[in-house]
């Protein structure tokens, strides 16, 4: 009488830490913060690690000139348990846990895994194979205001965003059922990077003359967006420890 869910699930743990500082003078204000989040999931081999930082600064250089600087950074590392059943990753593991018969044992008396046509999800979890996802993002902006004359202000600002992502899914060759041939081990990797640049120049005039007012705005905007993407796949690696793309059989490569 096998309880598949009890055999697989664990208690997830989350811890979070933050440090913030702020201060300044009459002409300068600043704020900075850093944070860390660590989390383990309810399935073995599932976890998340996040680091983030942010800083803001406002400066009155002169009575007419002000500068604003903002920067932020965040990095996430995810691990998700992988399955050997045609993709699906942890979703496939959860599906198997919910449909397997309680008449099938997790382990046989001889220590081998209980056999099913679709695979044994506990064997997948015990192998330690994971889907690894990495993402980092940086955002920075700078703005300068200058009061040219009474009512006339110029603002120049620019910003930059860069986002980097890496996906890696290695499927091990697991011989858990002697009566059924194992699929070859395989590796899929995806690399994505995008960046965006913005530039703005504004000239604002706002003046009241008695009962009349005049508002005029002139502006210029420029933007650039770059994207780079690469996907690779190979099979038949010499062993389950050498999970680098160059080690797979070149004849099986797809891009």
Give the ranges of each region predicted by the language model.
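Surface-exposed loop/interface segments of Gram-negative outer-membrane beta-barrel transport/assembly proteins
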Residues: 1, 41-48, 52-139, 155-255
């Amino acid at each position: 009488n096998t309880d598949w869910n009890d055999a697989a699930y664990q208690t997830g743990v989350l811890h979070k830490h933050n440090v913030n500082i702020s201060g300044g003078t009459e002409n300068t204000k600043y704020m900075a913060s850093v944070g860390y989040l660590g989390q383990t999931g309810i399935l073995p081999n599932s976890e998340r690690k996040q680091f983030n930082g942010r800083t803001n600064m406002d400066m009155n250089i002169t009575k007419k000139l002000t500068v604003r600087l903002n920067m932020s950074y965040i990095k996430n590392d995810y691990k998700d348990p992988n399955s050997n059943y045609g993709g699906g990753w942890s979703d496939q593991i959860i599906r198997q846990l919910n449909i397997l018969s309680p008449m099938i044992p997790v382990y046989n008396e001889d220590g081998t895994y209980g056999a099913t046509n679709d695979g044994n999800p506990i064997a997948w979890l015990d192998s330690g194979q994971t889907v690894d996802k990495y993402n980092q993002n940086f955002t920075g902006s700078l703005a300068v205001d200058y009061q040219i004359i009474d009512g006339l202000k110029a603002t120049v600002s620019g910003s930059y965003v860069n986002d980097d992502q890496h996906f890696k899914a290695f499927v091990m060759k697991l011989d858990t059922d002697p009566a059924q041939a194992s699929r070859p081990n395989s590796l899929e990797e995806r690399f994505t990077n995008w960046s965006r640049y913005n530039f703005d120049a504004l000239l604002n005039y706002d003046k009241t003359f008695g009962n009349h007012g005049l508002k005029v705005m002139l502006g210029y905007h420029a933007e650039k967006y770059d994207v780079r993407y690469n996907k690779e796949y190979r099979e038949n690696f010499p062993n389950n420890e050498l999970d680098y793309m160059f080690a797979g059989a070149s004849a099986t490569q797809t891009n």
